[in-house]
Structures are given as structure tokens and as C-alpha cells.
Amino acid sequence: MSLSINAVARTQEGKGASRRLRNEGLVPAVIYGGETAPVSISFKDNELLKAVGTPGFLTGLVEVTVEGKTEQVLVKALQRHPSTGAVMHMDLQRAQADKAITTRVPLSFINAAQSEGVSKQGGRLTVESKLAEVRCLPANLPEVLTVDVIKGQLDQIFHLSDVILPEGVELVSLLKGEDHDQPIARIGKSKR
């Protein structure tokens, strides 16, 4: 499932133009990548705020419609105001159907409460990494990657190699070799 948001093309660029846009309730952004020239756009800040709060917006594919033309993009950078948290600017990268993309996907740890390490040995699951960097075609991009910890014992460490990968999806760290199989969670003693 990809999310959709509307944008408007903009002609003025630079710090002053961006400041004027923000004062009008708009957020400047740029779509770049692929075979096409970068496009400067702006979003209505209230629509963008709603979209940013939607699960998967920052880690999945987003359909952006600019003047009737729809493109699939990934959010590559999001700048926020330091005190208000308002979105100040966004960089979006085009996703081409035939070219692999690299992005971060959320990890979901399932069956922790039923694992022997938690239910019988009094342990607690501690998540060390909430995201994993993947490489795949845009059509294969998962919303979430699952790690089943049902067989977890006390003092067991779960690594990237324990992630259940859908077909056509690779973990970038594991492509570098086995010594990059970093820990992502562990079942340790509860501090009760």
C-alpha cells in the first residue's frame, strides 16, 4: 500500500522564497533522481503534517501528484524546525520500477511474550534496532520486516540474519559479509 499526497510545482527557489512559502502555510520540497531533472514543489503544511504522521510515510513508497502527474517517491530527508517540530523542507527521490532502491524499513518483533526466555525464564526483550536497511525493487518494498522471537531463550541475541525476508528483498548489511550481521534485539534478565 502506498500513500498519496498532492503537491504544487513552484518556480521560485532559495531561502527567501522558501520562507515566503512557509509563511503562506506551504512546505517546500524537491523531487530528484532518475532520468528526469529535479522538480521544486510545495505541499500544504496541514496535509503534509497528516501524511508524515501516517505509518509508512517516512519509510515506504509515496505517490506524489504534481499538476496531474503522479510519481512514486521515497522520503530521503526531512528537515524539522528545532523547537516546534514543524516540517521545514523535504527531499524526495524518484523510485523507478526497474531499478533497485535502498531504504530503511521498520522491524517488528513478534511472539516475544510467548518465548521461553520471557514467559518461563523471566527475561525481557530489548530492541536495539528499530529499522533495517534493505535493497529491492519498488514493487517488492515491504511495509515492515518481521523477526519471530518465539524460540528465544534468556541471554539470546537476535541478529539481522534472523529477519524474515520477503522474496526479492536483501539486507544491505548482510550483502557486505557475515561479519556485518549486527545484533538487533536480545532477551535479557528483567530488572524487576
Swiss-Prot record:
Coiled coil segments of this chain: none
CDD domains: Ribosomal_L25_TL5_CTC
Keyword Glycosyltransferase among UniProt keywords: no
GO CC terms, sorted: cytosolic large ribosomal subunit
Keywords noted in UniProt: Ribonucleoprotein, Ribosomal protein, RNA-binding, rRNA-binding
InterPro entries according to UniProt: Rbsml_bL25/Gln-tRNA_synth_N, Ribosomal_bL25/Gln-tRNA_synth, Ribosomal_bL25_b-dom, Ribosomal_bL25_C, Ribosomal_bL25_long, Ribosomal_bL25_short, Ribosomal_L25_dom, Ribosomal_uL5_bac-type
One GO term (biological process): translation
Span of the signal peptide: none
Family the entry assigns: Belongs to the bacterial ribosomal protein bL25 family. CTC subfamily.
Protein purpose: This is one of the proteins that binds to the 5S RNA in the ribosome where it forms part of the central protuberance.
Record NCBIfam families: bL25_bact_ctc, PRK05618.1-5, PRK05943.1
Protein name, per record: Large ribosomal subunit protein bL25
Organism the protein comes from: Marinomonas sp. (strain MWYL1)
Record gene name: rplY
